Amino acid sequence: MADNKTSEGIVSEETPMDASQEQQHETVEEMLARHRQEIKQLQNKETEMKKAAAKGSKAEQKAKKKQVEDDISKLSTKLKDKQLKELASQGFSSSSSNNIAKDETTEKKGDIDTLVRAIAGVSVTAQQEHSKPSKSVKRREKRAKEEADREQRIKEEQSHVKSDRMVENAKLEKKLKPLGLTVSEIKPDGHCLYRAVENQLANRSGGASPYTYQNLREMAASYMREHKTDFLPFFLSETEGDSNSGSAEERFEKYCREVESTAAWGSQLELGALTHCLRKHIKVYSGSFPDVEMGKEYRSGDDSSLMLSYHRHAFGLGEHYNSVVLVNNITG
């Protein structure tokens, strides 16, 4: 398996001949330093493997965790055996080596198992299953799991949004196709409602729109201010729970300022204002909700209605408006 092959490189990345030649010129201190580095690399590898194993479903995570434990156990054993042999070549002896008397030098150096533990500092999990993981190991494992869980949630949310968007678009297409209509995409920059209306006005005039999206914002805000008594009840119902930020009139004025001077997303309040400003019938198609019509009193027989589409699941950030045009008359 690929991970095993990569992990075994921690144990030895040299050929036997190269390792033998290097060890002939290696001091005990250098060897011990190398051993510590090898153990540290194995610990890091264990953390990486556990992080990778924390992804996927619970069943997949359980299977991966068991595989990681087996792999780390094998690598730990292999690394320990290698280091024991190298220690023995430097005069160290095991405490269980057939009761052979230890010479003075060996007595001072201590038995191999003790030295290996001293070199390791903090052993990898497979080597000390009987002892509790250190706080740093627990923190690393916790961070790895939290990051993996976060990535999994993001994937699930993106998948959910994508699925909802596909369903919504399919329903909208089914509604528009028999009418010979289709959606003309509008930039999702916060001005989408006003840009969609601008696009419709341009299509109806056969040239440029008489109003830019910014003009339309200012017109909507001005009309709402002039007809405050008509819009205030709807505004309050939409902003219920914001009473701590000032009086109703103050909050309504702040809302109007945002409409005319920021990229705040538009809603039915602004559409209602625009239908009167422009004296146009506006119809909003949707794949998620019933179609909405505003300004029916302005509807005429010359097919001058403005047509938009409302998308609840277009983007992860929220709602969006597009322009609806004849199939053979798509414009930017």
Curated annotation (Swiss-Prot):
It catalyses: Thiol-dependent hydrolysis of ester, thioester, amide, peptide and isopeptide bonds formed by the C-terminal Gly of ubiquitin (a 76-residue protein attached to proteins as an intracellular targeting signal). Its EC number is 3.4.19.12. Keywords: Coiled coil, Hydrolase, Protease, Thiol protease, Ubl conjugation pathway. Hydrolase that can remove conjugated ubiquitin from proteins in vitro and may therefore play an important regulatory role at the level of protein turnover by preventing degradation. Inactive cysteine protease. Deubiquitinating enzyme which regulates gene expression by contributing to chromatin organization and DNA methylation patterns (e.g. H3K4me3 and H3K27me3). Involved in the interpretation of environmental information, probably by altering chromatin organization and maintaining redox homeostasis. Required for phosphate (Pi) homeostasis (e.g. It comes from the Eukaryota. The gene is OTU5. Residues 25-85, 138-158 form a coiled coil. It is an enzyme of class 3 (hydrolase). It comes from Arabidopsis thaliana (Mouse-ear cress). It holds the Pfam family OTU. Residues 23-85, 101-114, 143-165 have a biased composition (Basic and acidic residues). Residues 1-165 are annotated as: Disordered. This is OVARIAN TUMOR DOMAIN-containing deubiquitinating enzyme 5.
